[in-house]
Amino acid sequence: MASESGKLWGGRFVGAVDPIMEKFNSSISYDRHLWNVDVQGSKAYSRGLEKAGLLTKAEMQQILQGLDKVAEEWAQGTFKLHPNDEDIHTANERRLKELIGEAAGKLHTGRSRNDQVVTDLRLWMRQTCSKLSALLRVLIGTMVDRAEAERDVLFPGYTHLQRAQPIRWSHWILSHAVALTRDSERLLEVQKRINVLPLGSGAIAGNPLGVDRELLRAELNFGAITLNSMDATSERDFVAEFLFWASLCMTHLSRMAEDLILYGTKEFSFVQLSDAYSTGSSLMPQKKNPDSLELIRSKAGRVFGRCAGLLMTLKGLPSTYNKDLQEDKEAVFEVSDTMIAVLQVATGVISTLQIHRENMKQALSPDMLATDLAYYLVRKGMPFRQAHEASGKAVFMAETKGVALNLLSLQELQTISPLFSGDVSHVWDYSHSVEQYSALGGTAKSSVEWQIRQVRALLQAQEP
């Protein structure tokens, strides 16, 4: 229980803590986010103490009722912090003592803040992962719905930011949706590793008082129990894994945002953002800026920084708990808030995006069919390397003459290869071009529809 100084650890100390150190050491400004899960963990632990014979039933009921009152005050915004509340655990225990008296001093029996805080963090992150998983599935579902509705729209596909081949607009959407399905799978796997109970591990050596950890696990609905008390209280690999998941997901979202920023410029004019996800200029009245997408792109760097920062904190720590681990929570809270906002904004952008079909169509050009010209020769029996060279010669001839590739006459093409014949005219049909790529995963309509079914099946399988 807290000493006269209000500290949970004050018994062996003489004199006051330097006020600067007091502020430096305090984490209540941000770990107050854990108030609800801290109460949940304490309620479960009180039941464990009662089963172990360390609390009477009356004492347990007194503690449970007091904790309910603490939670009620937090929920209603009436909980008052004191200057000595250095963290959420101190604050809740101090208030519990004010409400129920000395019985509150038994709650911490055999428990350390080391196993308490990591239990709180795992509980909080488990809830947050569920929320993020739901938001990510909504975004992916929105993208798939759009891909299905606009699967007949063709536009240029790019490599090296140069026009490459005609593809379906839906194929582009699905390329990003499929990447996000892997992020969705990864998040569920991270959540499984978060969902492991450390409570009952004490500070380092374990619990000597017969507390039933299986009871604690069941009370808090954890999937498993940590295997080693030293590892349980000091390891933050689950935090690092969550931050890496967020970094990778933000990488995918940032790349999609970059594409849409480019496609929305006057130079491309393929898409137009809704006013709801754009802003203007304080000087230039004509401007409509894609701030939503630019912020998604920029916040990726913020998330990366949090991930790298935590790894740097962890890499040099000696075994078991060190105060350095206090740095984990700000990273988790900030990244969680960022991801929630980004996923919601990205869903809004995709659901309200306007596409300019005619501009997409006009951007298609015959030179993008040079690969198809090579495939034409392959189907006539020419080895691909020779066909590639022949198509390249046709491109060079067209550029030299200053004409489009499809305007070369049959006679001119036959000077490159006698395998060219009248049916080469089919090569210049963009719809015919995309339909060639019918192998699973390609841009043909049948393949795009197969992709849509596959992604929807993945989403359904991930529903809780």
UniProtKB/Swiss-Prot annotation:
Pathway this chain belongs to: Amino-acid biosynthesis; L-arginine biosynthesis; L-arginine from L-ornithine and carbamoyl phosphate: step 3/3; Nitrogen metabolism; urea cycle; L-arginine and fumarate from (N(omega)-L-arginino)succinate: step 1/1
E.C. code: 4.3.2.1
Domain of life of the source: Eukaryota
Molecular function as annotated in GO: argininosuccinate lyase activity; identical protein binding
Ligand binding (2-(N(omega)-L-arginino)succinate): 27, 114, 159, 289, 321, 326, 329
Keywords attached to this entry: Acetylation, Amino-acid biosynthesis, Arginine biosynthesis, Lyase, Urea cycle
Top class in the EC scheme: lyase
Reaction(s) the record says it catalyses: 2-(N(omega)-L-arginino)succinate = fumarate + L-arginine
Cross-referenced SUPFAM superfamilies: L-aspartase-like
BP GO terms, sorted: amino acid metabolic process; ammonia assimilation cycle; arginine biosynthetic process via ornithine; L-arginine biosynthetic process; locomotory behavior; positive regulation of nitric oxide biosynthetic process; post-embryonic development; urea cycle
Tissue expression remark: Expressed in lung and brain (at protein level).
Mod. after translation: Acetylation modifies enzyme activity in response to alterations of extracellular nutrient availability. Acetylation increased with trichostin A (TSA) or with nicotinamide (NAM). Glucose increases acetylation by about a factor of 3 with decreasing enzyme activity. Acetylation on Lys-288 is decreased on the addition of extra amino acids resulting in activation of enzyme activity.
Regulation of protein activity: Enzyme activity is regulated by acetylation.
Entry-annotated residues carrying N6-acetyllysine: 7, 69, 288
Positions where N-acetylalanine occurs in the chain: 2
Active site positions: 160 (proton acceptor), 281 (proton donor)
Positions bearing the site annotation: Increases basicity of active site His: 294
Function recorded in the entry: Catalyzes the reversible cleavage of L-argininosuccinate to fumarate and L-arginine, an intermediate step reaction in the urea cycle mostly providing for hepatic nitrogen detoxification into excretable urea as well as de novo L-arginine synthesis in nonhepatic tissues. Essential regulator of intracellular and extracellular L-arginine pools.
Family according to the record: Belongs to the lyase 1 family. Argininosuccinate lyase subfamily.
Assembly and binders: Homotetramer. Forms tissue-specific complexes with ASS1, SLC7A1, HSP90AA1 and nitric oxide synthase NOS1, NOS2 or NOS3; the complex maintenance is independent of ASL catalytic function.
Name of the featured protein: Argininosuccinate lyase
Record organism: Mus musculus
